[in-house]
């Protein structure tokens, strides 16, 4: 049997995706599932698809297990998109798309995907094959199948990490619109179709070369950059693309597809492909990206953030699209820092940044942080979102007089006595008979009240007098109590009246609010956008968690912790990786974060070390406004906060200390409240409660945020706060199980410690 599927949720994304890895070796734990894990990252990247991983599973190359999983994810979990990776080659056990015949001359048999799908999507399979063939001739050995089952799109991707990523990018521009079509998202589909109608038809070439084949013409479409097109218009001469530009990637297709289609599907140019050279050391993918560009027009570097509304300018700051191409010179200039690292002896011995009080720093962060714009989402994706509009009921609830209890609909004026039963009214049905004097009708909870009745008597206040011979019907019942008019009946509009405001602008939605939207039939709502957060760690000493330790190296924990902290609050994240202590690398990484995210979080490189260049890069290269560079607090003294305003769009930058505990504490103190404000929460401040100390605590000259575990004792109104032990800022163990931060005052001559049982303020940072 297959390994147990891992179900993940992220309520903030609209496209629910399942990733299915088909591999005997991965299933038996003989190999790592690099392809599946990479696809999950690509799906969740807000600058690409911006989807939610709702299901993930590894199965062996067994056709029945593949089919069982696909059917379950389509019919039961109702996913929007399923990506399979593996089993698409020529090997005997490659049965994901279709199975080879067991005996000669018996014809091609259906495999897992072909047996499951109801309609094929051959265009997507063709796009993957064409793109793969431009990368390697071995692409012809792939047998992908794409198709539809119900409202779910199923895509077969290759088994390798590289191949699956490339094929995912080839089809990415069309995925959001395809899913909108399957979900019958009428508004979004109409917007796209309207934009397609508005697109001008390309003029025919003035004198096409006689050797130009239809295939070549297909490759040429959409490749020219806008600047070159403008030059051609001015000169009145039309030309075709050079034959070397034959690899049509997602980015190239995006140049001719409406933004509403590609808002979640633009290929992002990796940092290491900015150069146009195609040396043998480059990967085939990098070479293919370079071949897309002409000598004067490199691959577009701009991206659009997910769900950007039609006509709204890209929020990419200085990289805002002014033209679809930048020169090689501009790209190289942007990649070099102006920070001088040669004069080590002249570096600062004392920080040039004044100490800022915690209160002032916190107020500054909230004052400088903007509230993001709005977007329209499906109500199912509203968990954790903030409404940007009032929501009104369009119908009464209940829309008919409804019974509150199981019993009998009666005429109150009849009083107690024996009554004939004329039928029944059940929930979901409208009774057609009228209750006359001396009659009653049996009703269930929630059922409509029949005409003529004006009260309900619960079944407990009745006695059955007569039934049918076979016991299947009640014929006569005795009413034992006097009913009053309106008794146990919910009148029309009793719960919600038509036109009533059921949810106000600024409401932070939870499960009840989602249910209320469903109740009133409001399936699309306007909400504030979620901020996209990019996270990176800095330091030459850092290794990825999966790497073996080397002399002088440590594993990077900050990035994982910060990403998890942000994701715990539901915000989409971008992993920028580890960046070395080099101004050029820092500048490139920051530029990438600025182009893809609303908020950039870094850890390390902000203290007084000779390799701490981050503040200089922010100041000298990016011309960011550094609002504070030191905070009078423990831990987190070198915490830095900066903003960057480009073309009317503000980017927020938090440069956090490199010590693990300092990074987590300052993230909770500054970053999380800022993100809450950006998404429109009216009071973004953290929750602070009172608690009693479980032990004596010595005070520090600085205000301290001491990690603790909050627990409640029986019949005591206040929780007790237990210290997590050694509070050294490098000791991440002090954060283990911590759900609160003791907000300790600075030491004075009168107070050098707080004693057990004293009441202190505690900031809640975890589940209680």
Curated annotation (Swiss-Prot):
Residues 14-166 are annotated as: MPT Mo-transferase. This is Gephyrin. SUPFAM superfamilies: MoeA C-terminal domain-like, MoeA N-terminal region -like, Molybdenum cofactor biosynthesis proteins. Residues 326-768 are annotated as: MPT adenylyltransferase. A lipid is attached at residues 225, 297 (S-palmitoyl cysteine). It comes from Rattus norvegicus (Rat). Residues 200-212 have a biased composition (Pro residues). Homotrimer, homodimer and homooligomer. Interacts with SRGAP2 (via SH3 domain). Interacts with GLRB. Interacts with GABARAP. Interacts with GABRA3. GABRA3 and GLRB occupy overlapping binding sites. Interacts with ARHGAP32; IQSEC3, INSYN1 and INSYN2A. Residues 153-348 are annotated as: Interaction with GABARAP. It is a lipid-anchor. NCBIfam families: Glp_gephyrin, molyb_syn. CDD domains: MoeA (cd00887), MogA_MoaB (cd00886).
């Amino acid at each position: 049997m297959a390994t147990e599927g891992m179900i993940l949720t992220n309520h903030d994304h609209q496209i629910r995706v399942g990733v299915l890895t088909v591999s005997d070796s991965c299933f038996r734990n003989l190999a790592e599932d690099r392809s599946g894990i990479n696809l999950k990252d690509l799906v969740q990247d807000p600058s690409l698809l911006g989807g939610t991983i709702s299901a993930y599973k590894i199965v062996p190359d067994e056709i029945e297990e593949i089919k069982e999983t696909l059917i379950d994810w389509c019919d039961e979990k109702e996913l929007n998109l399923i990506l399979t990776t593996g089993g698409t080659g020529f090997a005997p056990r490659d049965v994901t798309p279709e199975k080879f015949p067991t005996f000669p001359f018996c014809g091609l048999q259906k495999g897992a995907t072909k047996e499951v799908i109801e309609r094929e999507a051959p265009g997507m399979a063709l796009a993957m094959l064409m793109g793969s063939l431009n990368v390697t001739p071995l692409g012809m050995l792939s047998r992908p199948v794409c198709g539809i089952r119900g409202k779910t799109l199923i895509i077969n991707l290759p088994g390798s990490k590289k191949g699956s990523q490339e094929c995912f990018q080839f089809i990415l521009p069309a995925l959001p619109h395809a899913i909108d079509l399957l979900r019958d998202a009428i508004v979004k589909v109409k917007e796209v179709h309207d934009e397609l109608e508005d697109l001008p038809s390309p003029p025919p070439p003035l004198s096409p070369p006689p050797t130009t084949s239809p295939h070549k013409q297909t490759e040429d479409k959409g490749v020219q950059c806008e600047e070159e097109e403008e030059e051609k218009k001015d000169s009145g001469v039309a030309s075709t693309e050079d034959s070397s530009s034959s690899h049509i990637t997602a980015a190239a297709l995006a140049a001719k597809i409406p933004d509403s289609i590609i808002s979640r599907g633009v290929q992002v140019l990796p940092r290491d492909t900015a150069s146009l050279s195609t040396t043998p050391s480059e990967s085939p993918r990098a070479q293919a990206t370079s071949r897309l560009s002409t000598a004067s027009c490199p691959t577009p570097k701009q991206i659009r953030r997910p769900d950007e509304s039609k006509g709204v300018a890209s929020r990419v700051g200085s990289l805002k699209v002014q033209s679809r191409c930048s020169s090689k010179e501009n790209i190289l200039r942007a990649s070099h820092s102006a920070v001088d690292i040669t004069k080590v002896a002249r570096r600062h011995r004392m920080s040039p940044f004044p100490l800022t009080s915690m209160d002032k720093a916190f107020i500054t962060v909230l004052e400088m942080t903007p509230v993001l714009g709005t977007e329209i989402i499906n109500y199912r994706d509203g968990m954790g979102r903030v409404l940007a509009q009032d929501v009104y009921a369009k119908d009464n609830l209940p829309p008919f007089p409804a019974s509150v209890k199981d019993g009998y609909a009666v005429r109150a004026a009849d009083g107690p006595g024996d009554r004939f039963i004329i039928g029944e009214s059940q929930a979901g049905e409208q009774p057609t008979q009228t209750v006359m004097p001396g009659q009653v009708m049996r009703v269930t909870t929630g059922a409509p009240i029949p005409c003529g009745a004006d009260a309900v008597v619960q079944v407990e206040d009745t006695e059955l007098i007569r039934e049918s011979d076979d016991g299947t019907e009640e014929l006569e019942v005795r009413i034992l109590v006097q009913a009053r008019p309106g008794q146990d009946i919910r009148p029309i509009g009793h719960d919600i009246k038509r036109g009533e405001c059921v949810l106000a602008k600024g409401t932070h939605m939870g499960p009840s609010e989602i249910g209320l939207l469903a109740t009133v039939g409001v399936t699309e709502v306007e909400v504030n956008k979620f901020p996209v957060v990019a996270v990176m760690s800095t330091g030459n000493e850092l290794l990825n968690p999966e790497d073996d330790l080397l002399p002088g190296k440590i594993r990077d924990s900050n990035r994982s912790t910060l990403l998890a902290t942000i994701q715990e609050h539901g915000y989409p994240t971008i992993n920028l990786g580890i960046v070395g202590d080099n101004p050029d690398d820092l500048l490139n990484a920051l530029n990438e974060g600025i182009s893809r995210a609303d908020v950039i979080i870094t850890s390390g490189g902000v203290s007084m070390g000779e390799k701490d260049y981050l503040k200089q890069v922010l100041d000298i290269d990016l011309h960011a406004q550094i609002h504070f560079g030191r905070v009078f607090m423990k831990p987190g003294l070198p915490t830095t906060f900066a903003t960057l305003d480009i073309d009317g769009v503000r980017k927020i930058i938090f440069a956090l200390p490199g010590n693990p505990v300092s990074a987590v504490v300052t993230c909770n103190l500054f970053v999380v409240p800022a993100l809450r404000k950006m998404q429109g929460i009216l009071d973004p401040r953290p929750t602070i409660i009172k608690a009693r100390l479980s032990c004596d605590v010595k005070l520090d000259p600085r205000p301290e945020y001491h990690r603790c575990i909050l627990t409640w004792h029986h019949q005591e109104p206040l929780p007790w706060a237990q210290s997590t032990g050694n509070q050294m800022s490098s000791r991440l163990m002090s954060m283990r199980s911590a759900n609160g931060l003791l907000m300790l005052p600075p030491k004075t001559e009168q107070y050098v410690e707080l004693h057990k049982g004293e009441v202190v303020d505690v900031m809640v940072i975890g589940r209680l």
